[in-house]
Swiss-Prot record:
Belongs to the ARMET family. GO terms for biological process: dopamine metabolic process; dopaminergic neuron differentiation; neuron cellular homeostasis; neuron projection development; synaptic transmission, dopaminergic. It is found in: Secreted. One of its GO terms (cellular component) is synapse. Its main location: secreted. Coiled coil: none annotated. SUPFAM superfamilies: SAP domain (SSF68906). Disulfide bonds join 28-114, 31-103, 61-72, 148-151. Required during the maturation of the embryonic nervous system for maintenance of neuronal and cuticular connectivity. Essential for maintenance of dopaminergic neurons and dopamine levels. Residues 1-22 form the signal peptide. This is Mesencephalic astrocyte-derived neurotrophic factor homolog. Keywords: Developmental protein, Disulfide bond, Secreted, Signal.
Length: 173
């Protein structure tokens, strides 16, 4: 009887760990949003056949730009794509698998798929710089064509942005 309870507890913990490790939309935003948008564009008859899904995806990719275009390139949806893992998208879509799960599978095949990110537009007048990631602080400086020599910690980047803020916030108005 104790063994049975132990098996149930271990099974529950394994499920709990698996759900906490599941891919979130913000971890792979371009993939999730593109797959959702593509899936919504398909009619019911196309959704059932993975070959038709692949053909529709290639047609869909011809109209995409920027990050979505790069996503299509990684999957093999473009003529100039070097590799093709399109069946990793089309078959799960034909099974009605959610976009997050599809992107999780795609990430296992090609990690750079989830490295694609949309550019964040940061309003410096309303944002709390302390809550931003260092990557976003570096992006602000990079957008201004400024550097932060010797900046190692988040506080250093915030200090540099605060120094330059008057110069750039006036020109944006």
């Amino acid at each position: 009887m104790k063994t049975w309870y132990m098996v149930v507890v271990i099974g529950f913990l394994a499920t709990l760990v698996q759900t906490s490790l599941a891919l979130k939309e913000e971890d792979c935003e371009v993939c999730v949003k593109t797959v959702r948008r593509f899936a919504e564009s398909l009619d019911d008859s196309t959704k059932k056949d993975y070959k038709q899904i692949e053909t529709a995806f290639k047609k869909f990719c011809k109209t995409q730009k920027n990050k979505e275009h790069r996503f299509c390139y990684y999957l093999g949806g473009l003529e100039e794509s070097a590799t093709g893992i399109l069946n990793e998208l089309s078959k799960p879509l034909s099974w009605s698998m959610p976009a997050e799960k599809i992107c999780e599978k795609l990430k296992k095949k090609d990690a750079q798929i989830c490295d694609l990110r949309y550019e964040k537009q940061i309003d410096l007048n309303s944002v709390d710089l302390k809550k931003l990631k260092v990557r976003d602080l570096k992006k602000i400086l990079n957008d201004w064509d400024e550097s932060c020599d010797g900046c190692l910690e988040k506080g250093d980047f915030i200090k540099r942005i605060e120094e330059l803020k008057p110069k750039y916030s006036r020109s944006e108005l």
